[in-house]
A protein has these predicted regions:
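Tandem repeat scaffolds
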Residues: 1-136
């Protein structure tokens, strides 16, 4: 099933509303996506604004040309995202996020705060971390 150009502002979504669905050019605003198991999902050209994204499990999950702004990402194993994987983060808090072995060339991480995040063997060539802070 595909959802195109929709603004989603419902505060609490159910896991079944998101799994098995492809989203294109949608805006997710003030959404809480905590403890979800995303299976067979694709988000392309979507924007996530002021969202809480914690402790996700990702299976057959794609993220293509998406933007995260003013979001909290915590306990996410981004290494489970399928290729291609392209996104930008602006003014986001990232805690315990695993980027190990991802190819994130030319990714944008502007004014983000990284706490206890893993980047081992991650390809970050030409990525922009302007204004970002790192703490372990």
């Amino acid at each position: 099933m595909g959802i195109i150009e929709k603004r989603i502002t419902k505060r609490h979504l159910s896991e079944s509303e998101l799994s098995g669905v492809n989203y294109y050019n949608c805006i997710f605003e003030r959404i809480q996506l905590d403890n979800f198991n995303f299976r067979d999902c694709e988000f392309e050209k979507c924007r996530f604004v002021n969202c809480s994204i914690k402790n996700l499990k990702l299976n057959f999950f794609k993220l293509i040309d998406c933007e995260f702004k003013d979001c909290l990402l915590q306990g996410v194993n981004a290494a489970d995202i399928m290729f291609p994987c392209t996104f930008s983060l602006v003014n986001c808090d990232l805690r315990f996020v695993d980027f190990i072995s991802l190819r994130l060339q030319e990714s944008i991480f502007l004014s983000c705060r990284f706490r206890d995040c893993l980047f081992e063997e991650t390809d970050l060539r030409k990525s922009d971390f302007t204004g970002s802070e790192f703490n372990n």
